[in-house]
């Protein structure tokens, strides 16, 4: 299934290569490779495969999950769709505090609730782990994370391990 998703990402032009003018990721890293997983939302056949695979990963690796939390902004639609497939509630974490009472978590999250974070892409895992920290600070039990794509960077793997978070 992963090979089918990888091929699908290439087919829809989500994975871009440019060795002459590298992409600058949100982390500041310059890379000749960029994956725009938002494009899966406009490719229904691939979107269905991606969301079903994410749902399968949640069921297999995090069977005790009670709620899915998407990362802003690209993880939000995937969390919503996977939540629909699994009949689970979903919410998301804002990247910055909202003006109204500084609220960062949208949706109802109860202390002690078992959470799976839904992310579109992981490089250094910095933004993903910021979401994990917000959730833990709110009393959630973060079981782990699922993502569409990871660059498999050592820094990201090390950051996830240091935070005690598994990504599948």
Task: Name each model-derived stretch.
Residues 3, 44, 48, 52, ...:
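Electropositive phosphate-/nucleotide-binding environments in soluble metabolic enzymes
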Residues 30, 72, 77, 109, ...:
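Gly/Ser/Thr-rich beta-alpha loop segments that engage phosphate groups in nucleotides
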Residues 93, 97-168:
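PRPP/pyrophosphate-binding module of the type I phosphoribosyltransferase fold
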């Amino acid at each position: 299934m992963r090979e089918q998703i990888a091929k699908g990402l290439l087919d829809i032009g989500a994975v871009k290569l440019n060795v002459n003018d590298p992409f600058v990721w949100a982390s500041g890293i310059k890379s000749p490779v960029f994956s725009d997983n938002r494009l899966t939302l406009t490719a229904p056949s691939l979107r269905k495969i991606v969301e079903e695979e994410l749902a399968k990963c949640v069921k297999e690796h995090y069977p005790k999950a009670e709620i899915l939390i998407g990362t802003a902004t690209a993880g939000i639609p995937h969390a919503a769709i996977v939540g629909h497939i699994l009949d689970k509630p979903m919410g998301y974490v804002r990247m910055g505090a909202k003006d109204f009472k500084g609220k960062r978590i949208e949706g109802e999250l109860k202390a002690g609730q078992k959470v799976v974070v839904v992310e579109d892409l992981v490089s250094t895992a910095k933004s993903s782990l910021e979401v994990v920290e917000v959730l833990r600070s709110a009393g959630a039990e973060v079981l782990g994370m699922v993502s569409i794509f990871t660059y498999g960077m050592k820094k990201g793997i090390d950051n996830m391990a240091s935070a005690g978070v598994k990504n599948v």
